[in-house]
Curated annotation (Swiss-Prot):
PANTHER family: PLECKSTRIN HOMOLOGY DOMAIN-CONTAINING FAMILY G MEMBER 5, PLECKSTRIN HOMOLOGY DOMAIN-CONTAINING FAMILY G MEMBER 7
Membrane-crossing segments per the record: none
Region (Disordered): 124-177, 348-437, 572-595, 608-627, 837-877
Organism in which the protein naturally occurs: Dictyostelium discoideum (Social amoeba)
Name of the featured protein: Uncharacterized protein DDB_G0289917
Classification lineage: Eukaryota, Amoebozoa, Evosea, Eumycetozoa, Dictyostelia
Stretches with biased composition (Polar residues): 131-157
Biased amino acid composition, Low complexity: 158-177, 352-431, 572-593, 841-857
Example GO biological process: Rho protein signal transduction
Length: 968
């Protein structure tokens, strides 16, 4: 039989009697002879046409004539690329489509599986589906098994035959009803009812149907490409779409998985992304430096806006899609690694048939379960050891599955529970994700309400501790203050120190708002401080959101603990939330819905406020307007989320390295004796090991109060300076400046400066006392802090972490093949020495050079040596970095261009000097920039190789600790 006139045609011979060996000739080019493959020896995923077309999801077979199905054993078919714009009506043979409906893997020794060809037209019928038997290893990750089957037409089981007839005519290992029902759900979930099939993106995307596929995107997704087109001028949004789609189309599943990890901020993906963009995209229009961030942002926007496109792009296991969406969503829950949500694929092939329930319209149950009693109306349930009575339609109960319907979308994970659910949206689960058209609810409960009988007879009744509700108009954050009915024990997971950083500090280091969620266990009864101290700390970081009127948990009567500082302190922080203030906060958050997301994420407690003078201005100016703009809304010494992304995503700093102790005199997490307080001393939020007399410590101290929400009485947080003998002595030193800020409930940031009265004292500690009802219930002490008044007294930067980024991988600047390298270094403290006036450019002044953001101090004792310009300027001690190549080449990178050697000036051109990772105020000619007191960055043209790198201050003879074997 001849091939059809198409570039992609195949011929399949069906022999009902002899099925051991079936030959499939494949032809991609009419000029080349067809190639033959035997299913007995060739796995399906190695056939050429399966590399281009996902046979399980996007291949439809079109017969040459209807007689071929009934009178002949050999039929001629050709594949149709399923997807909008891919179906052609040019051939009259398209009148009798035959669709590949299902795949089921046998578990017998032969490991054969059958592909059933069943006509989807009611006019054509066959006595039994033709089958293809193949010796194919069962692999759950193979595309043929994991890819769902999508049908845009009415299910054939409702057109041709009844369920009983199906079961008689189907092969033994062929189960249509379960898969067909799931295929319909998947269509509704991804919004693919208008698309004929929803196949693999590799089959859907082509230059011919690219325009149609792009037009089928949502307006939000199109806007993403328009934004990218503006960044890649003069490229149009459709060209950007084609570039990205072609790029993703050529990736392997492993590479796509790495991209998914990159979107979820998981490490070790930089090399792949850089390689792909450097080779596949036009570097001139799509710079490789920004390529990773652009693709990352693009995927985040698309995932959040257009589920259908994500389905086309990542036709992997459905749990990958959900995991990708959950991790990228701004409102995703952040949980400890040991308690992370575990979601399975929606259409996961269940090998244990003893745990499947199929319920049809007539309440016909085919159950192989143990201890299952189900009364369902039009339901499809998969329950484990549950007794459920459900009286609503479209409720799907199964472990780790996702159901998304227009009306009722319930996702229940019931373990050894007896539940009576008589209304919609009743959830009693361990891990559940409910996606409604109006409400998105994420529930997270740890070992709660096991082996209990619960009756839920009202709408929206939840029995768990943490609720995170996202409506289309309102965002609500709940704390359930009620305990289980039978007072069952609540097990709170114990967090290790390394988990504390990932759970507690992302809101400080990443600058997302912080909320320490308390584990309420009191039955509306006041707890004693002793009971509070015994409770374990379980911080779950969420985005503080607005309370809606539909909240089943009314939190108006919940009193938020007050933080009160003693009258003798200069700064007092009192937090009291009343009903009126809650209403004001709701109005403010409603106004913020149209504002940039980063503005909404900034805690109100650290936002800049208008001065009283401006508020009382009567000169006709608008109240609240000011020309002066705050440099940053974040506390000094804490990096912004943009810069954290630069450190981690662009330069490759790992969380393990950023979690190391910054002040060497203490641990990275310092815990109090009773466990109520903790200090953070990591590279992201360091505690300075050295301070100058009278100068502000830019790093400050971050204090956390554990179980802060459990306290029902006033709390007082006192701070004092103590000596090495653990004594308080005001004759030796005192606070010059002190300010305690509440970043979020339970998270405090302490800014300070100290005066040293006794010059013989070299060391000091800061002690924090937590007072409840007039009694000190806990105290904690900072690591040792040393007084250093001049740069010559300061130690050289120690324990420096250094990472590099080659800005242009394919360009060299000299005969030694020097490349443009950007450096970022992190240490406990970097001193910025004053550059003498005679050495500076005329456009910059000594004051300007020493006023960079995050600068810890200048040379000299206190403010006396840096304020007046009339005094004779002392010799400065600026920072410098020495790079020594293994070949003997040495380069000194000075703080200012005026300090560079004449033969090395060409290595610091102006375009490199001006390039910094974040916009900061800097003097012209500065090579080393100080975005923070513990972070420096600089650029230079250096040859590749192995280096020994040393950080030190000029004219300071103290020993430095170099970094050995650093490869550029």
């Amino acid at each position: 039989m001849e091939f059809l006139s198409t570039s992609q045609s195949l011929q399949i011979n069906f022999d009902s009697q002899q099925s051991e060996q079936i030959q499939v000739p494949i032809g991609f080019d009419s000029s080349q002879p067809p190639q033959e493959f035997e299913f007995e020896t060739t796995p399906l995923n190695q056939l050429p046409f399966l590399k281009q077309i996902d046979i399980a999801a996007s291949l439809s077979f079109i017969p040459a004539s209807i007689e071929n199905l009934t009178t002949e054993n050999t039929i001629t078919v050709f594949p149709v690329l399923v997807g909008q714009g891919a179906f052609s009506q040019q051939d009259s043979l398209l009148q009798f489509p035959v669709s590949l409906q299902n795949i089921n893997i046998n578990n017998n020794n032969n490991s054969n599986f059958q592909l059933g060809l069943v006509p989807s037209s009611p006019q054509s019928s066959i006595s039994s589906p033709s089958t293809i038997e193949s010796n194919y290893l069962s692999n759950p990750s193979s595309p043929c098994q994991s890819t769902p089957i999508l049908e845009s037409s009415t299910p054939f089981s409702q057109k041709l035959m009844s369920n009983e007839q199906q079961q008689q005519q189907q092969p033994q290992n062929f189960s249509f009803p379960q898969k067909q029902q799931q295929a319909v759900d998947l269509n509704e979930f991804f919004g693919l009812n208008s698309v004929g099939g929803g196949g693999h993106f590799k089959a859907c995307f082509s230059p011919d149907n690219s325009f149609n596929l792009y037009n089928d995107l949502s307006p939000e997704a199109k806007s993403c490409f328009k934004i990218f087109a503006k960044k890649c001028k003069p490229t149009t949004e459709h060209e950007v779409f084609n570039k990205v789609m072609n790029l993703l189309n050529n990736l392997t599943l492993e590479e796509i998985d790495l991209i998914i990890k990159s979107v979820s901020r998981i490490e070790k993906y930089d090399t792949l992304i850089a390689k792909v963009f450097a080779t596949e995209l036009d570097v001139a229009n799509f710079p490789s430096i920004n390529a990773k961030l652009l693709l990352q942002n693009l995927l985040v926007e698309i995932i959040d806006q257009d589920r259908k496109l994500v389905y086309h792009l990542f036709q992997l296991d459905t749990d990958h899609i959900h995991s990708l969406k959950n991790k990228c969503s701004i409102l995703s829950i952040s949980t400890p690694a040991s308690d992370s949500l575990n979601f399975s694929a929606l259409l996961q092939e269940d090998s244990n048939n003893n745990n499947n329930n199929n319920n049809n319209n007539n309440n016909n149950n085919n159950n192989n379960n143990n201890n299952n009693n189900n009364n369902n109306n039009n339901n499809n349930n998969n329950n484990n050891n549950n007794n459920n009575n459900n009286n609503n339609n479209n409720n799907n109960n199964y472990n780790n599955n996702y159901n998304n319907n227009n009306n009722n979308n319930n996702n229940n994970n019931n373990n050894n529970n007896n539940n009576n659910n008589n209304n919609n949206n009743n959830n009693n689960c361990n891990n559940s994700l409910v996606n409604d058209s109006n409400t998105n609810i994420i529930n997270h409960t740890h070992n709660l309400n096991y082996n209990q009988n619960q009756n839920q007879n009202l709408n929206n009744n939840y029995n768990y501790d943490y609720n995170f509700t996202n409506d289309t108009n309102n965002n609500v954050y709940h704390q359930n203050n009620t305990s289980p009915a039978n007072n069952s024990p609540y097990v709170t997971p114990v967090l290790k120190d390394n988990e504390l950083h990932s759970q507690l500090l992302p809101q400080i280091a990443h600058q997302q708002p912080v909320a320490v969620l308390a584990n309420y266990q009191h039955n509306q009864q006041q707890q004693s401080p002793q009971q509070i101290q015994q409770q374990l700390y379980n911080p779950h970081l969420q985005i503080l959101s607005q309370q809606t009127n539909s909240n089943p948990h009314n939190t108006e009567n919940i009193e938020v603990p007050k933080i009160k500082l003693q009258p003798n302190f200069q700064s007092t922080t009192t937090t009291t939330i009343t009903q009126q203030q809650q209403q004001q906060q709701q109005q403010q958050q409603q106004q913020q819905q149209n504002t940039p997301l980063i503005s909404q994420l900034i805690p109100e407690s650290i936002k800049p406020k208008a001065s009283n003078k401006l508020a009382n201005n009567s000169n006709g100016k608008k109240v609240g307007s000011s020309k002066k703009v705050s440099k940053s809304v974040f506390p000094k010494g804490i990096i912004t989320p943009q810069y954290f992304s630069i450190l981690k995503d662009r330069f490759g700093f790992t969380m393990e390295s950023l979690e190391k102790a910054s002040n060497p005199n203490g641990a990275n997490y310092i815990h109090s004796l009773n466990g109520s307080l903790a200090l953070v001393n990591t590279c992201l939020v360091p505690i300075s090991s050295e301070v100058s007399t009278g100068r502000d410590s830019k790093n400050g101290v971050v204090i956390t109060v554990k179980n802060y929400g459990d306290y029902t009485t006033k709390l007082t947080l006192e701070y004092e300076l103590v000596t090495s003998n653990n004594e308080v002595n005001d004759d030796k030193f005192s606070f010059k400046k002190k300010n305690l800020l509440m970043v979020e409930p339970g998270i405090f940031y302490f800014q300070y400066s100290m005066n040293r009265i006794d010059k013989n004292e070299k060391e000091v500690y800061i002690r924090f006392n937590l007072i409840c009802e007039g009694k000190v219930i806990d105290s904690i002490q900072s690591p040792q802090i040393r007084f250093r008044n001049t740069p010559s007294e300061f130690d050289q930067p120690n324990n420096v972490q250094l990472e590099t980024l080659i800005a242009d991988q394919f360009k060299t600047y000299s005969d030694d093949h020097s490349v443009h390298v950007k450096f970022v270094a992190i240490a406990n403290l970097f001193k910025k020495g004053i550059i003498p006036k005679a050495s500076k450019d005329s456009s910059s002044s000594p004051t300007a050079s020493s006023a960079a953001p995050g600068d810890s101090s200048s040379d000299g004792e206190g403010d006396e040596q840096s304020s007046t310009s009339t005094k004779k300027m002392k010799k400065g001690k600026p920072l410098e970095v020495t790079l020594k190549h293994s070949s003997g080449f040495t380069l000194v990178i000075p703080q200012h261009i005026s300090k560079a050697k004449p033969e090395d000036i060409w290595r610091f051109p102006k375009n490199l000097i001006s390039q910094t990772n974040i916009p900061i105020k800097k003097s012209e000619g500065d090579i080393i920039h100080f975005p923070y007191s513990y972070v420096v960055e600089f650029s230079a043209l250096v040859p590749r190789g192995n280096y020994t790198i040393t950080f030190g201050y000029e004219f300071v003879n103290k020993k430095a600790n170099p970094i050995h074997n650093f490869v550029i």
